[in-house]
């Protein structure tokens, strides 16, 4: 029977992954209404900051470091990489494609992070010669193949018996050169957003090491910076103040849901799960978000689904699990080396102790 420490992270991550899948599907629907995607992002980050303020005050007020210029600069960069710029490209890509494609490309995150770690020499290139290294490279390449399939092969639309005839008619009218161009651009924007998120994870790893035990305060400060950054980036599309007044009730509800569940709660749950089980365990739940987004988008929101999205998603998820298999082998090898080293040291100490006792017994009286 599983103990609470074992099943609790599984249950929490399942709920969180399903919620994130639904967030992406709902956000796609909200963007289709015509809201400025960076105004949406600014509201989302502002709501996240407001939600995280009490958590950071109650649990981290005694351990929180002083606000220095360097700390502010670091969190400004963190907000730029992991929130504002990432959302700029990701939400733009989502508006041009679908929730299924967006979640499939996000599943490439571990592989892209590994590739960037190699480029910046955070990951040792010598490790690529091992079995774990070969598996990680294979997984990364398969993920890239899946991304290319998602991008360049849309495929036929799978019929949805629940979709409204008028919606299907409008979708058929939108087919053509412009629609294909938007699809390709959308996939490109999603890949750029995922790369930015990977860069943020590498940067955040160093930031978390520098400021341990302050995940709520750090995320709250990042969200504050990101909300202002998103507001500035929104000017590229519209400078009309009226665009900030959202009257559509559905968009308002989605904005609140995305800020509370998709940003604040997701950050807290993910941070707790990483602390309890590790980042690799958390990465294995990416397909759950993908399946949830697909089902929510197709069955509830009645959006069209394409064959290329399904095939590309399957290839991408296959690459993800090959990569995670390599990570598991690497971890097992590291643990084995540590145990062998510890056993060797213990045997050496016992041997030295035996020799010392033997010498003592041979001393003349």
UniProtKB/Swiss-Prot annotation:
| Stretches assigned to the EamA domain | 20-151, 216-324
Disulfide bridges in this chain = none
Q: Where in the cell is it found?
A: Membrane
Q: Where is the composition biased (Basic and acidic residues)?
A: 348-365
Biological process GO terms, please?
Answer: seed development
Transmembrane regions: 7-27, 39-59, 76-96, 100-120, 132-152, 183-203, 216-236, 250-270, 280-300, 305-325
Q: Which family does it belong to?
A: Belongs to the drug/metabolite transporter (DMT) superfamily. Plant drug/metabolite exporter (P-DME) (TC 2.A.7.4) family.
Q: Could you tell me what this protein is called?
A: WAT1-related protein At4g01430
- Tell me what organism the protein belongs to: Arabidopsis thaliana
